[in-house]
């Protein structure tokens, strides 16, 4: 429409006759989509009309004004005006105008419902939302209605939608609600309310028609969320009677949450029946995690792809005379081989490894526990020669090295982390109480850390008193380990007595080490407590001592871990920007990584400005936080944000950038992540440079281990498959970040590692190698990185070979004869060789990598790769839960025959066969004698002789 026509309609608004004004409004409404800019200049005239109570078509004026504000992208004003237009604003209209305003209305309603609701909301908003609920139910768009109901915290509507939905769709809706509840709700109390509703629907379905396998998992984890251990125990017991593999799978899911206090109660509540004793024992072993440790150990040894040349390359490039580099290299090797049991590098370089002294020796020896972490029963055997004298299994000869003794005790704790093994706990407790041993700080320090790890989350009051006595001695080194051990034992329990004692002692002592440890311990005690920890958080964050505020921000991080809670995020951002202490600001940023790891894609938006902060401590924290939240994801935005920090002017920022990048690039290869090769070269350049800062060298060496951890088969994973934050993993990672103050804490990263594999096991708890599955991607996309190629000529001094003149003349005559023969043969062969080359070239072009491949059990499967996993139909072994395509999966054997091969069994049979072969037969297989080496004349050597 022409501009003059619009002006004519606008002029009608200024007429005295109301009928002419109405005509003007009607005409303008019809052309507002294309002429809103001109109409916007006359909003005052339109406002006068809808404010005039005597005007008969006020609603039409509201509607026109709403359309103008909509095109101006002032959606809230447009919504308020549209709601006043009454019948003109039709919610059912399928237009962009209606859709955007309805979404704005719903968002405002949700925000109001999620707030404290102290302010009143326009009742018309609720009217629109109610109309949308009715529309969703009328159109059978139940998921949309359920989504609005969940976000607006309308439990009545959730119940109504589920009750009124068709029975065939109800199961799907309940499962959808469960996923939303676990992954999206950041309010603990509301999540509990929804879980109670879910349980009632699952129970109803169980009674009427039975549950699907994955619904049993959802029901058991709903019991876990509400702490209903008796119901969970009864569910497992019922399944043992009718579906043993499913009962074992449910137990595995409960165990993976690492909620140790709940698991302990479930075990105690299991019915005791003699007819069921063997299966009950198996379930207890699964719930306790013992079975999974053994399975993971076998798998990590079987799949181990650790490149021996990789660590040798670092070893040859690093100046090991510097204690920091020497210790970092030993820790790097332990991270590389975590859980694999492969300590060959240490054995091959035992003299070099033993050069470490004092606390470096303590940390290095403890790192052996990382390598052998899957075999806790062998702990004393592995550390036998380093245990304190006078103890069972301890060293009986030679001068004692207290740092070795303490490191061995720490290593035993690492191997027993979370096992709560009574014998190990008693052994470490006896050392702490032994007056001959507890006078030595390294021994007591190692024993306390070991005890805390072995009794992780046990809430054992006896151990608390033992450690409290050590803490009361007010010795900086031993007090630090005792305070941290109290936090480990009370982790996730919110124990009031422990909180009171830690707060009291933290504010009374003068030792910074102890103050920091008490703050960190309080963070561990508050793990996963959310709103229940607000009192502790408030008292820590308002303290004048910045070290306690440091503990306060970490407490926020662990209390709200994996929730993406807006209140927690705002609080951490406030302290990251406004606190006067660098330590507090750095820790606040790191804590954001723990709070937001469940929605890591949102991290770059929040971290964008922090990454460019003038404060190097904030930049360091940003790199570490991104690494924690995005570990193993290869998330490009996070990598791009950290990349400038790799060349930062501050040494410790570069260290943090390397560690953060290594965490993100775990298990990547050149095909999935083009930046990997460049990053590895950066690490190599940093640790090889003679005059590089030692902090950067340490970061580069540790990062080299992290990026290929656990034989290239382990990754930092802070949550279970179902999205529950894992206590041990989160605790291990938060203590690892404190290596800033105490480098032996690097060993705690082992608690955060988990295998990246799909492991199928049958109800005998063995791994059938006959089971296989299909992965619908090219193998090279997620395959192991290429191993380092050994250059045989590298690092070897070349010598010029001396030959006699007669030998040269003989070779020349032979060469003439050969040339004559070759000239004739070349003509004959030329034609055929060209044809062969052509055929080979054609074959290469035809040989394209297939888009899928078959993976045998157990197989390496990355978290981001699991969506491509497909189980083969009509296969002998079928998974109990087909939705589970990662981690431990129990299988149904459809043939139930004895003709099966298992991981480890076939290997033993092969070893037995090899033992039966006579030694002479082995010797006869290699009759060729190697030729002598070329004669090399070294003039310098002759002169020396």
Model regions: which residues?
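Extended alpha-helical assembly domains of large eukaryotic scaffold proteins
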Residues: 1-799
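Eukaryotic intrinsically disordered, low-complexity regulatory tails and linkers enriched
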Residues: 629, 722, 735-945
């Amino acid at each position: 429409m022409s501009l003059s026509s619009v002006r004519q309609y606008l002029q009608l608004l200024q007429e005295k006759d109301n009928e002419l004004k109405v005509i003007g409004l009607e005409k303008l409404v019809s052309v507002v989509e294309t002429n809103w800019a001109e109409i916007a200049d006359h909003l005052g005239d339109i406002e006068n009309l809808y404010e005039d109570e005597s005007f008969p078509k006020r609603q039409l004026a509201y509607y026109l004004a709403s359309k103008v504000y909509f095109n101006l992208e002032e959606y809230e004003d447009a919504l308020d005006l549209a709601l006043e237009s009454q019948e003109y604003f039709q919610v059912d209209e399928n237009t962009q105008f209606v859709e955007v305003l309805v979404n704005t209305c719903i968002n405002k309603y949700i925000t109001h419902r999620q707030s404290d609701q102290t302010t009143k909301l326009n009742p018309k908003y609720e009217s629109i939302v109610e109309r949308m609920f009715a529309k969703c139910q009328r159109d059978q768009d139940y998921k949309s209605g359920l989504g609005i109901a969940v976000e607006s915290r309308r439990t009545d509507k959730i119940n109504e939608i589920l009750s009124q939905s068709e029975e065939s769709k109800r199961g799907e809706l309940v499962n959808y609600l469960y996923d939303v509840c676990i992954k999206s709700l950041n309010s603990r109390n509301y999540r509990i309310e929804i879980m109670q509703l879910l349980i009632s629907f699952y129970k109803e379905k169980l009674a009427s028609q039975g549950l699907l396998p994955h619904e049993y998992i959802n029901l058991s984890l709903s019991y876990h969320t509400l702490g209903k251990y008796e119901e969970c125990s009864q569910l497992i017991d019922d399944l043992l009677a009718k579906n043993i593999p499913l009962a074992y799978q449910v137990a595995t899911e409960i165990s993976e949450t690492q909620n140790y206090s709940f698991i302990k109660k479930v075990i105690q509540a299991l019915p005791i029946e003699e007819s069921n004793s063997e299966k009950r024992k198996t379930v207890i072993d699964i719930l306790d995690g013992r079975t999974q440790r053994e399975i993971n150990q076998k798998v990590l040894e079987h799949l181990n792809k650790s490149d021996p040349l990789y660590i040798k390359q670092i070893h040859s490039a690093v100046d090991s005379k510097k204690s920091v580099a020497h210790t970092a290299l030993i820790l790097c090797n332990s991270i590389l081989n975590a859980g694999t049991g492969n300590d060959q590098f240490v054995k091959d370089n035992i003299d070099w490894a033993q050069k470490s002294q004092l606390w470096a020796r303590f940390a290095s020896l403890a790192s052996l526990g990382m390598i052998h972490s899957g075999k806790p029963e062998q702990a004393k055997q592995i550390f036998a020669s380093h245990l304190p004298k006078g103890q069972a299994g301890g060293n009986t000869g030679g001068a004692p090295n207290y740092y070795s003794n303490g490191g061995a005790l720490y290593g035993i704790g690492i191997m027993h982390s979370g096992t709560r093994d009574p014998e190990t706990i008693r052994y470490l407790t006896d050392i702490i109480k032994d007056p001959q041993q507890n006078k030595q700080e390294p021994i007591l320090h190692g024993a306390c850390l070991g005890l805390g790890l072995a009794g992780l989350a046990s809430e054992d009051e006896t151990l608390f008193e033992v450690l409290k006595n050590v803490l009361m001695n007010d010795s900086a080194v031993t007090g630090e380990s005792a305070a941290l051990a109290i936090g480990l034992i009370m982790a996730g329990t919110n124990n009031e007595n422990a909180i009171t004692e830690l707060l009291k002692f933290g504010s009374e002592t003068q030792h910074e080490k102890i103050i920091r440890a008490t703050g960190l311990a309080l963070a561990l005690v508050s793990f996963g407590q959310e709103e229940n920890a607000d009192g502790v958080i408030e008292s820590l964050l308002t303290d004048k001592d910045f070290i306690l505020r440091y503990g306060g921000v970490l407490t926020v991080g662990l209390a709200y871990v994996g929730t993406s809670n807006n209140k927690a995020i705002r609080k951490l951002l406030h302290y990251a920007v406004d606190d006067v202490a660098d330590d507090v600001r750095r820790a606040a940023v790191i804590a954001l990584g723990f709070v937001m790891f469940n929605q890591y894609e949102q991290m770059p938006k929040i971290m964008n400005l922090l990454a460019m902060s003038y404060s190097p401590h904030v930049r360091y924290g940003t790199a570490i936080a991104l690494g924690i939240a995005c570990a193993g994801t290869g998330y490009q935005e996070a990598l791009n944000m950290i990349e400038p920090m790799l060349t930062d002017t501050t040494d410790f920022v570069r260290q943090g950038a390397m560690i953060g990048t290594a965490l993100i690039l775990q298990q990547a290869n050149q095909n999935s992540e083009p930046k990997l090769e460049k990053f590895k070269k950066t690490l190599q350049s940093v640790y090889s440079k003679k005059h590089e800062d030692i902090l950067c060298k340490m970061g580069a060496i540790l990062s080299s281990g992290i990026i290929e951890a656990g034989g290239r088969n382990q990754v930092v994973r802070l949550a279970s498959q179902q999205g529950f934050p894992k206590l041990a993993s989160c605790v291990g990672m938060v203590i690892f970040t404190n290596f800033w103050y105490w480098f032996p804490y690097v060993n705690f990263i082992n608690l955060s590692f988990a295998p990246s594999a799909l492991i199928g096991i049958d109800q005998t708890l063995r791994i059938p190698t006959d089971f296989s599955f299909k992965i619908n991607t090219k193998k090279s996309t997620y395959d192991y990185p290429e191993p380092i190629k050994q250059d045989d000529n590298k690092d070897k001094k070349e010598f010029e070979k001396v030959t006699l003149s007669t030998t040269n003349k003989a070779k020349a005559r032979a060469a003439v004869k050969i040339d004559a023969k070759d000239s004739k043969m070349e003509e004959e062969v030329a034609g055929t060789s060209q044809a062969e080359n052509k055929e080979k070239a054609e074959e290469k072009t035809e040989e394209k990598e297939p888009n899928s491949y078959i993976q045998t059990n157990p197989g390496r499967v990355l978290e981001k790769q699991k969506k491509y996993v497909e189980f083969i139909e009509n296969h002998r072994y079928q998974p109990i839960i087909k939705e589970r395509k990662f981690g431990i999966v129990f299988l149904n054997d459809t043939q139930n025959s004895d003709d099966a091969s298992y991981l480890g069994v076939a290997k033993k049979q092969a070893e037995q066969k090899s033992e039966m072969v006579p030694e002479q037969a082995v010797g006869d297989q290699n009759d060729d004698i190697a030729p002598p080496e070329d004669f090399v004349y070294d003039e310098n050597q002759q002169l020396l002789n």
